[in-house]
Amino acid sequence: MTRISSDDVRKVSKLARLEISEEHVETYANQLEEILEYIAQLEKIDTKNIPPTTRAVEVVNVLREDIVDKSNVRDKILDLAPNREGQFYRVPKILAE
């Protein structure tokens, strides 16, 4: 069994930039140990005759032919803008020059 120390939890939380209070460090250490035990069980499973897959159910794209259609959606959307300039949205400046 892999033992996760409190120092390990602190190190991982620092690398992940997560703030963990001292009162939760031991809890997370125990939870990480349980996760690693579960992974160790999964590693023991014989998967030699199981083909690799990316999903449990095969997904098939249903393709359709593109149809060009005239629309005035752009104007309708622009009419909803609180502030616009011609055919463009006008947004507040967020970056300094």
Curated annotation (Swiss-Prot):
Signal peptide: none annotated. Heterotrimer of A, B and C subunits. GO terms for molecular function: asparaginyl-tRNA synthase (glutamine-hydrolyzing) activity; ATP binding; glutaminyl-tRNA synthase (glutamine-hydrolyzing) activity. The lineage of its organism: Bacteria, Bacillati, Cyanobacteriota, Cyanophyceae, Synechococcales. It comes from Prochlorococcus marinus (strain SARG / CCMP1375 / SS120). Pfam families: GatC. It catalyses: L-glutamyl-tRNA(Gln) + L-glutamine + ATP + H2O = L-glutaminyl-tRNA(Gln) + L-glutamate + ADP + phosphate + H(+); L-aspartyl-tRNA(Asn) + L-glutamine + ATP + H2O = L-asparaginyl-tRNA(Asn) + L-glutamate + ADP + phosphate + 2 H(+). Its EC number is 6.3.5.-. This is Aspartyl/glutamyl-tRNA(Asn/Gln) amidotransferase subunit C. HAMAP family: GatC. The keyword ATP-binding applies. Allows the formation of correctly charged Asn-tRNA(Asn) or Gln-tRNA(Gln) through the transamidation of misacylated Asp-tRNA(Asn) or Glu-tRNA(Gln) in organisms which lack either or both of asparaginyl-tRNA or glutaminyl-tRNA synthetases. The reaction takes place in the presence of glutamine and ATP through an activated phospho-Asp-tRNA(Asn) or phospho-Glu-tRNA(Gln). Keywords: ATP-binding, Ligase, Nucleotide-binding, Protein biosynthesis. Belongs to the GatC family.
